[in-house]
From Swiss-Prot:
Protein name in the entry: Xylose isomerase
Enzyme class: isomerase
EC number(s) stated in the UniProt entry for this protein: 5.3.1.5
Catalytic site: 100, 103
Origin species: Burkholderia vietnamiensis (strain G4 / LMG 22486)
C-alpha cells in the first residue's frame, strides 16, 4: 500500500523551478569544500512529529487523519506507520531518520509487552532500512510521556521508575546498535523540578549521573561505537531542567567525570528558550569539546514555548554552519528535523512542503557559510584581535611564568598603560551579510 502515491519523488530542479514539490537549492551531489551537500548535511527526518503527532494541542484534539493512526491492532498500525515513514524518507531522498522507542512500537501494558513489541518492530525497521537504504542517525527512549514519569525518570523519587527507565534505555540502545545507529540521544524532558519545596537537588543530580554512568557502561559492554548525546533544554515540560544549556551540561559532565563519554545534541528552539542564539550554543559546544549533532527547527519569537517549526532563516543557519564547517563538520551527527507542520496543515503534501523548504534553507545556509570559511576574514580578524597573547609576554602569563604578585610588579615596573582597540563589530557583520547576500 502506498500512503503518498500522488506525490512524486522529490528531485533537484534548480532555483528557476516553480514546482513546490522539488528542491530549488538542495542538489545532494553538488560539491562544496570537498564534500557533497548530502555528505555535509546528513539530513534526518524524525518519527515523532512527522508520523506520531496527531495534530493536538493543549486546547484541542488532533486534526490529522492518518491511516496508521486509526483504531486497530497496535502492532499492525506500527507496521503501517513504518511503511509510511520509509515511503516518505525515500521520496524525500533523505539518508537518515530518528526515533523514540515508543514512536515505533506500542508500549503495551507492562515491561514484557513493551520489550516484545519493540523487538518485533526493530526487526521490521531493519527490513525497511535494508530495502530502502535509509539509515538510523540516532535512537532514543521516551522517558517523559507516560504518567509514571511525571516526576522524572532517572531523577524520580521512586527507584522502580528508575528501573523501568533503565529497561527502556537498555533496549533502545541495543536497538540503535543493532540498526546501525550512529548516535544515541538522552533527553531529560522531566529530569528537573516543578517546585523546590519537594525537591532534593543534590540527590536528583546524583541519581541522574548514576543513570548516565550505567548507560556509558552498557554502551561499551555491547560494543556500540556511536556517540552518546544529551539534548539540552532549559524548561518545558518541567519548570527547570538539569540539562539547561550546553554550558550547564558540560559542567554536569565534568562534575561526574563523564566529559569524555557524552556530547550534546543541540536543538535550535531549545537554545532560544534558554536565552541564547543557536549560534551561541553551537560555538560553545565546540569551545567545550562536546559538539555532537543538531536538531534543526525554530521557535516563534513571540511565543515563550517550544513550537518546533521548520527552520526558514538562512541568516541564522549560516552562522551555525560557519561554526560547524570551520571545526571540520559533522562526524557521527547530522541535521535532524525535530520540526512539525502546523496544526492546520492537514494535507499529506504539507509534510513534504515543510521538509522540502527546510532542506533548501539548509543548503543555502551551508553554501553561504562555505563562502565565509573559504576566505575566512572573520577568523583572520579574530586572530589579529588576540595576537598579543601569542607573543612571548602573553604565552608566559598562560604557561604559569608569572604569579599574581610578579605580574603586578612587572606591570608597575613597565608602566603598563594599555589603549583600547576597536572590536570592529560592524565590519564583521558586514562581512557576514556580504557572504549571505552577494550575487554569485
Amino acid at each position: 500500500m502506498s500512503y503518498f502515491e500522488h506525490i512524486p519523488a522529490i528531485r533537484y530542479e534548480g532555483p528557476q523551478s516553480d514546482n513546490p514539490l522539488a528542491y530549488h537549492h538542495y542538489d545532494p551531489a553538488k560539491r562544496v569544500l570537498g564534500k557533497t551537500l548530502a555528505e555535509h548535511l546528513r539530513i534526518a527526518v524524525c518519527y515523532w512529529h512527522t508520523f506520531v503527532w496527531p495534530g493536538h494541542d493543549m486546547f484541542g484534539q488532533g486534526t490529522f487523519v492518518r491511516p496508521w493512526q486509526q483504531p486497530g491492532d497496535p502492532l499492525e498500525r506500527a507496521r503501517m506507520k513504518a511503511d509510511a515513514a520509509f515511503e516518505f524518507f525515500s521520496k524525500l531522498g533523505t539518508p537518515f531518520y530518528t526515533f523514540h522507542d515508543t514512536d515505533v512500537a506500542p508500549e503495551g501494558d507492562n515491561l514484557r509487552e513493551y520489550t516484545a513489541n519493540f523487538a518485533r518492530m526493530v526487526d521490521y525497521l531493519g527490513e525497511r532500512q535494508q530495502a530502502s537504504g535509509v539509515r538510523l542517525l540516532w535512537g532514543t527512549a521516551n522517558l517523559f510521556s507516560h504518567p509514571r514519569f511525571a516526576a522524572g525518570a532517572a531523577t524520580n523519587p521512586n527507584p522502580d521508575v528508575f528501573a523501568w527507565a533503565a529497561t527502556q534505555v537498555r533496549h533502545a540502545l541495543d536497538a540503535t546498535h543493532r540498526l546501525g545507529g550512529e548516535n544515541y540521544v538522552l533527553w531529560g524532558g522531566r529530569e528537573g523540578y516543578e517546585t523546590l519545596l519537594n525537591t532534593d537537588l543534590k540527590r536528583e543530580r546524583d541519581q541522574f549521573a548514576r543513570f548516565l554512568s550505567m548507560v556509558v557502561e552498557h554502551k561499551h559492554r555491547i560494543g556500540f561505537n556511536g556517540a552518546l548525546l544529551i539534548e539540552p533544554k532549559p524548561q518545558e515540560p518541567t519548570k527547570h531542567q538539569y540539562d539547561y544549556d550546553v554550558a550547564t551540561v558540560h559542567g554536569f559532565l565534568v562534575q561526574y567525570g563523564l566529559q569524555d563519554e557524552i556530547r550534546v545534541n543541540i536543538e535550535a528552539n531549545h537554545a532560544t528558550l534558554a536565552g541564547h542564539s543557536f549560534h551561541h550554543e553551537i560555538a560553545n559546544a565546540f569551545a567545550l569539546g562536546v559538539f555532537g549533532s543538531v536538531d534543526a527547527n525554530r521557535g516563534d519569537p513571540q511565543n515563550g514555548w517550544d513550537t518546533d517549526q521548520f527552520p526558514n532563516s538562512v541568516e541564522e543557519l549560516t552562522l551555525a554552519f560557519y561554526e560547524i564547517l570551520r571545526h571540520g563538520g559533522f562526524t557521527t551527527g547530522g541535521m535532524n528535523f525535530d520540526a512539525k507542520v502546523r496544526r492546520q496543515s492537514v494535507a499529506a503534501e504539507d509534510l513534504f512542503y515543510g521538509h522540502v523548504g527546510a532542506i533548501d534553507v539548509l543548503a543555502l545556509a551551508l553554501e553561504r557559510a562555505a563562502v565565509l570559511v573559504e576566505n575566512d576574514r572573520l577568523d583572520a580578524l579574530r586572530r589579529q584581535r588576540y595576537a598579543q597573547w601569542d607573543d612571548a609576554f602573553g604565552r608566559k602569563i598562560l604557561s604559569g611564568g608569572y604569579t599574581l604578585q610578579s605580574l603586578a610588579d612587572d606591570a608597575l615596573a613597565r608602566g603598563v598603560n594599555p589603549q583600547h582597540v576597536s572590536g570592529a563589530q560592524e565590519r564583521l557583520e558586514n562581512i557576514v551579510n556580504q557572504a549571505i547576500y552577494a550575487l554569485r
